[in-house]
Amino acid sequence: MRVIGLMSGTSYDAVEAAAADLELEGEALVMRPLGHLSAPYPDGLRDLIADSLPPAAATVRTVARLDTGIGQAFADVAVRAVRELCGGAAGLVVSHGQTLYHWVEDGAVRGTLQLGQPAWIAEATGLPVVSDLRGRDVAAGGQGAPLVAMTDVLAMAALPGVPAALNLGGIANVTVVAPGAEPLAFDTGPANALMDAAVRHFTGGAAAFDEDGRRAGAGRVDPGLLRVLLDDPYYGRPAPKSTGKEQFHLPYLLAALAAAPVAEPDDVLATLARLTAVTVADACRAHGVTRLVVSGGGARNPVLMGMIAEELPGVDLGSSDALGLPSDAKEALAFALLGFLTVNGLPGAIPSGTGARRASLLGSITPGREPLRLPEPAGEPPRVLRVVGGP
């Protein structure tokens, strides 16, 4: 089946699309990536998203505008993906949507909201769409995150030692696959979220992120600010756990700076990069990780990657590209995989990773132009991901 995955992460800067041919062969799920593309959100829509994220408040009218605008932006990218990546023919679109709110109380997730009306995608492409992938896991008592864990576990199944997959988006999440143990997956804390917020704040919105980590590389880590940031109780909570920009946002950073003032913006950025490195490393050390497979936007930040390497001496650090999963496309491919599992009657969440009571079939299906025809339910779930070929 030819599947398109659509994703926009907590950095909410663009819609990412990746396409792949997916097939079940015995214990293997065989993936042949077909390519990926990215399109920035229209400026007005991106600004509306930014203005609506916590701790800001949004009206129901704004939520409706966002649901339509994000759905239309995803639909535009899906049409391009069908044409440019799939030669005009695909069988399924899987849309993560845009997370606007992840509702956590006392460590338990009560709800999660991803916007981007899938009907726009189905109407534009004529294809069935799997969407709203997180809600079912939350209803089963899980965190609804990190859902990339299924792809991580399958991709690392044959690796020796104790491999872990690290995704550095707005939030950092890690999946640990230790021999003889259930897989573990959780959010370690902020990755780009606080750094991006700091850059926008210090530049008055002229820049959205620290390109190549240049400003962090020019700064010095401030021990006082780092101590204040590391005092957050989130880091001491046991996994499974998840977080988001509901917690790690600009007012959070400004409160930390009020407690531990830092004069130079570059020093703030260096400290935030070190915060990510320390919290990632603490999580990896706690589980004896020997190899770290990195993906996401933060993987392109050499200063951040260097700090993680400094914090984890002796750990083999590399890109998910080595496993056949391009770092920039991995999340979109992961959601393509989850939607493929759904239409084949297979669960997409890992209870030991999300904390759910059971492994659930994920998502809701919006039919395309033709009557909905699903494959016969598969028997056993795959145990390994085999990536072949490529674009």
Swiss-Prot record:
Signal peptide feature range: none
Alphabetized CDD domains for the sequence: ASKHA_NBD_ANMK
Keywords: ATP-binding, Carbohydrate metabolism, Kinase, Nucleotide-binding, Transferase
InterPro entries: Anhydro_N_Ac-Mur_kinase, ATPase_NBD
Keyword Zinc included in the entry's annotation: no
Top-level taxon of the source organism: Bacteria
Pathway: Amino-sugar metabolism; 1,6-anhydro-N-acetylmuramate degradation; Cell wall biogenesis; peptidoglycan recycling
Residues where ATP binds: G9, T10, S11, Y12, D13, A14, V15, E16
Catalytic activity: 1,6-anhydro-N-acetyl-beta-muramate + ATP + H2O = N-acetyl-D-muramate 6-phosphate + ADP + H(+)
One GO molecular-function entry: kinase activity
GO BP field: 1,6-anhydro-N-acetyl-beta-muramic acid catabolic process; amino sugar metabolic process; peptidoglycan turnover
EC numbers on record: 2.7.1.170
One Pfam family from the record: AnmK
PANTHER family: ANHYDRO-N-ACETYLMURAMIC ACID KINASE (PTHR30605:SF0)
Function: Catalyzes the specific phosphorylation of 1,6-anhydro-N-acetylmuramic acid (anhMurNAc) with the simultaneous cleavage of the 1,6-anhydro ring, generating MurNAc-6-P. Is required for the utilization of anhMurNAc either imported from the medium or derived from its own cell wall murein, and thus plays a role in cell wall recycling.
Similarity-based family: Belongs to the anhydro-N-acetylmuramic acid kinase family.
Official protein name in the record: Anhydro-N-acetylmuramic acid kinase
Species classification: Bacteria, Bacillati, Actinomycetota, Actinomycetes, Kitasatosporales
